[in-house]
A protein has these predicted regions:
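Acidic, Ser/Thr/Pro-rich beta/coil linker or hinge segments at domain junctions
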Residues: 3-17, 295-339
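Helix N-cap motif at beta-to-alpha junctions
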Residues: 282-288
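Glycine-rich anion-binding loops of enzyme active sites
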Residues: 44-57, 82-182, 306
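Extreme N-terminal cap/leader segments of soluble proteins
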Residues: 1-60, 79, 88, 110-118, ...
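Small-aliphatic-rich amphipathic alpha-helix that forms the alpha element of a beta-alpha
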Residues: 61-87, 104-115, 208-212, 232-236
Length: 339
């Protein structure tokens, strides 16, 4: 019997769960190992905890070094940790690689790390058979005090669900940078430039968001919505915590420019790669204070739902009960790259 071939994107969650459950974790110092919705590993290093993350850049080719640092920083930030040490693996395409290409990507990584105070401590590079574009994989290690650790498992019934900035910031930037010709009839030249600039403003980093939020009140869980967008991130938090997430899709902030870009490609903005927004659950009594603290620093924050006791689920309330939000099988922009 022929095995099913999976499309571009994350592995099906059932397969991924099965694979991760088989991972050998025998060291008692591993406080958090692999699991669906768990952004980072956590290791007991004595006085502090080490937080580790690995993430590739596969959709974008423009500013790939910048992307690689930011997406790894984001996951370290969602643990409440400080990013410290970066390791890069750079796979370059055969028949296309020049000194300028290798130097350009490497300098992007160095600059992005310097801006956040990260040391680049090692890695690997090669020209790889079969690639048609560069692939960059980053591994980032951070530190956090034991009492300051935030994990995706921390959400509890009654917590409020908050989202910073809006979605999908990253998809907007990628589509505008990779496929500008397909937006020429939809956006003005100034609007196209603005959409391309979403990489930096509002930006795909959530490091400031996480630091401000955790200092302002009780943050019980944080997550960085990447592939599969906000809806996938909500499902991952629900699975990690074991609870039901009830959300109001109409309350999710979508920048007007993002809405127009997604419409031009016929994409669902809630299921498109969304780095730049911080998804978090917070104590009900702290929700307003955390939002005010973020907004005082120029970071919009919206309450989009609540955590309830019940089975793992993500949905919206209707007159007939909880209507589940379908979990995306893959990120929306994968269709564009395939086409």
């Amino acid at each position: 019997m022929t095995e099913k071939i999976f499309p571009v994107g994350k592995l099906p969650v059932e397969l991924l769960s099965r694979l991760l459950a088989q991972a050998p974790v025998t060291d008692p110092r591993v406080l958090q190992g692999p699991g669906v919705g768990l952004d980072c590993a956590v290791i007991d290093a004595g006085e502090t905890l080490l937080v580790l993350k690995s993430d590739p850049i596969t959709f974008a080719t423009d500013e790939i070094g910048w992307y690689a640092v930011q997406v790894n920083v984001n996951d370290i930030a969602t643990a409440g940790a400080t990013p410290c040490w970066f390791i890069m693996t750079l796979l370059l395409p055969e028949g296309q690689t020049t000194a300028g290409l290798a130097e350009g990507i490497t300098q992007q990584v160095y600059q992005a790390c310097q801006e956040v105070g990260i040391s680049v401590v090692g890695g690997h590079s090669e020209i790889t058979f079969g690639l048609d574009r560069p692939i960059l994989i980053g591994t980032l290690i951070g530190e956090v005090r034991r009492e300051a650790l935030v994990t995706p498992r921390g959400a509890s019934p009654g917590d409020r669900v908050l989202l910073t900035k809006g979605v999908p910031i990253e998809a907007t930037a990628i589509l505008a940078r990779q496929f500008p010709g397909r937006l020429e009839d939809v956006l003005t030249a100034a609007e196209l430039e603005e959409a391309q600039g979403f990489l930096y403003h509002p930006g795909i980093s959530v490091l400031r968001d996480a630091r401000i939020a955790t200092h302002a009140g009780q943050v019980t869980a944080m997550h960085d919505p990447t592939e599969g967008g906000l809806v996938t991130a909500l499902w991952e938090l629900a699975e990690a915590s074991g609870h039901t997430f009830v959300v109001d899709p109409a309350a999710v902030p979508i920048p007007p420019l993002s809405r127009r870009v997604c419409a031009a490609f016929e994409l669902d903005p809630l299921a498109s790669i969304a780095s730049g927004a911080l998804l978090m659950t917070v104590g009900a009594e702290d929700a307003a204070r955390i939002c005010r603290a973020l907004e005082a620093e120029g970071i919009p924050c919206s309450e989009i739902g609540v955590v309830e006791s019940g089975p793992v689920a993500v949905g919206r309330r209707t007159a007939s009960g909880l209507e589940l939000l379908d979990r995306p099988e893959r990120d929306e922009i994968a269709r564009i790259f395939e086409g």
